[in-house]
A protein has these predicted regions:
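A glycine- and Lys/Arg-enriched "phosphate-lid" helix/loop adjacent to the NTP-binding pocket
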Residues: 67-113
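Conserved glycine(s) of the Walker
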Residues: 19
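NTP-dependent small-molecule kinase module
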Residues: 93-95, 99, 108-149
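Hydrophobic positions on the alpha1 helix immediately C-terminal to the Walker A/P-loop
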Residues: 23
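P-loop (Walker A) phosphate-binding loop of NTP-binding proteins
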Residues: 15
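Glycine-rich phosphate-binding loop used to anchor ATP phosphates in small-molecule kinases
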Residues: 29-82
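Phosphate-binding P-loop
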Residues: 1-7
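Hydrophobic anchor at the beta1->P-loop junction of P-loop NTPases
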Residues: 12
Length: 149
């Protein structure tokens, strides 16, 4: 639900190398840093809590409630083909922890968590050109502001 006097918080989520940071950086430049923007927050924390069998879920859920009561939140779930994620990891000389190597399983966990936890989210296919992705996101943010959510 959009609340007029609260700032918009845009949270970029998704598996490693799904394009979050690139999209965030270009979005910030194109919007002149007009929004509160985070690269990951509770969605990643909750997912990794499960994959790594941590016992912090209650803390993440409490923190999430606090964020949702303080901001108008838009979660941006960055997705791309698994083979592109593997290629990006290889090009960056990065490796996933053993428990995250089933990228499709991790992607499905992100999709489910975002769908279960947030009413206001957009899925961006980052296999497309960055300008196309940013324009789609700006359109969604503008709609959010114009339609009060």
């Amino acid at each position: 639900m959009y609340i007029k006097d609260k700032p918009i918080l845009i949270i970029f989520e998704g598996v490693d190398k799904s394009g979050k940071t690139t999209l965030k950086d270009v979005f910030n430049k194109k919007t002149n840093f007009s929004y509160v923007v985070l690269d990951r927050l509770t969605t990643s924390s909750k997912i990794y809590n499960n994959f790594f069998e941590r016992n912090r879920l209650k803390y993440y859920e409490e923190f999430e409630r606090s964020v949702l009561s303080s901001f108008n939140v838009l979660v941006v779930l960055c997705e791309c083909e698994t083979n592109l994620i593997i290629e990006r990891l290889k090009n960056a000389n990065e490796f996933l922890p053993e428990k995250l190597k089933d990228i499709d399983k991790v992607k499905a966990a992100f999709r489910k968590e975002v769908d279960d936890s947030f009413s206001n989210y957009v899925v961006i296919d980052t296999t497309r050109e960055i300008e196309e992705c940013v324009n789609e996101l700006i359109k969604r943010v503008n709609e959010m502001e114009e339609n009060n959510g």
